[in-house]
């Protein structure tokens, strides 16, 4: 169990502890080169991976006891565990480095779990904008066809209609200038007709639950456009924590899953708007 793994890692000066099958090939090569032995630097690297594996295991157990068992909103100790999925070209600015980590465990679902079918690698800003677009369009998960267009993490067009094409045309009409180079998210499987319309202007990313083969063929002509398939959209009412780093600490709050209803809207001007307004 974990105790044996930690014990072996602690003694990495003379023990090689392998917890990742991806290291089997390098281990065999190292042993072949050294007549059954391994180098210290290699063992130290294996030990680091072993400690990371046991730390992740312990963090997942800690999270279960803190949230699932005791129903604590904010536990005394917040144990975080994530696995690096990829290193990104740069961060929010070109001089910053960046990487994408995904939470350990089987239940995470969102833009980080989307499948990219085409296009160059996503940047830090692409992920940030696509996340904002997916979170917003998920508000309409069970609604009529809806299209969201986001630029710099802010919506510049949102519309619902009888068809996905009509919703896209209406969303684009909100601010066609800002939509150039933006991120699009939809709440329905993407069809070829809508894909053709989207391909008419430069778009960084399109995120959809699914896409028809014909829609994929349309986007295949746009080599720089990234098509992300998300599967079923996340539940906008799901609970969870939102975390933000500040200098010297973390700010943690519950997810913003509140919904605005018609009853909550009030007229605060002297004159009420007309139905057309």
Where do the protein language model's features map onto the residues?
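Active-site loop-to-helix "anion-binding N-cap" substructures in soluble metabolic enzymes
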Residues: 2-69, 73, 120, 154, ...
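ATP-dependent carboxylate/acyl-activation modules
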Residues: 57-59, 63-277
């Amino acid at each position: 169990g974990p105790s044996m793994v930690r014990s072996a890692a602690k003694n990495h000066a003379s023990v090689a502890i392998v917890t990742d099958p991806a290291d089997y090939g390098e281990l065999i090569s190292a042993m072949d080169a050294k007549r059954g032995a391994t180098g210290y630097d290699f063992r130290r690297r294996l030990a680091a991976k072993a400690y990371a594996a046991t730390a992740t295991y312990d963090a997942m157990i800690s999270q279960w006891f803190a949230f699932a068992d005791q129903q604590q909103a904010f536990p005394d100790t917040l144990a975080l565990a994530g696995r690096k999925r990829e290193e990104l070209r740069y961060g929010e600015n070109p001089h910053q480095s960046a990487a994408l980590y995904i939470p350990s465990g089987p239940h995470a679902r969102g833009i980080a779990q989307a499948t990219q079918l085409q296009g160059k690698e996503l940047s830090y800003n692409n992920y940030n904008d696509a996340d904002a677009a997916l979170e917003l369009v998920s508000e309409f998960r069970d609604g009529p066809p809806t299209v969201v267009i986001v630029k710099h993490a802010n919506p510049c067009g949102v519309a619902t209609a009888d068809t996905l094409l009509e919703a896209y045309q209406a969303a684009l009409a909100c601010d066609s200038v800002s939509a150039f180079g933006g991120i699009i998210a939809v709440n329905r499987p993407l069809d070829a007709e809508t894909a053709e319309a989207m391909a008419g202007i430069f778009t960084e990313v399109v995120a959809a639950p699914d896409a028809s083969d014909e829609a994929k063929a349309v986007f295949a002509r746009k080599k720089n456009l990234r098509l992300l398939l998300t599967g079923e959209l996340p539940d906008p009412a799901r609970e969870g924590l939102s975390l933000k780093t500040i200098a010297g600490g973390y700010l943690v709050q519950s997810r913003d899953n509140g919904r605005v209803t018609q009853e909550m809207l009030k007229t605060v001007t002297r004159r009420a708007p007309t139905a057309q307004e």
